[in-house]
């Protein structure tokens, strides 16, 4: 009997805790969705130096990494925009997302790539993600400022919003430095 209980406990222990995980898009699919006119995507590695990281900090943006992979969308050699993927913690699980940035530095589109939380999946709804379109540069990107919260998804909304703000700031710094 004890062996059966021990085996049952072991079986439960190895079952993934995230039974609600859903993958919606790959990073490549998201890039093509955001820039359908692109005929090529070039991945550039952008490394922020200490001064740039301090600039982000001064803007109230917490840089989780100094190195970022940025997809440059091109058509006939001309740059159309940029796509950056990232992951943030929702409540307890990771949310993978991608942000398309237009040449003027504004958000073109936000896509949720994977969502693993049991609640708060409403952040994937187009109406919520559309709030980011056109934001960037001098416009505030924050819950309560110009991005509405979703009841029951407060942490997911807040963390994805913080992530979008971070990506907008990182791309702006990289462009100022001539890295993009």
Segments (PLM) and residue ranges:
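N-terminal signal peptide c-region/cleavage motif recognized by signal peptidases
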Residues: 14-16
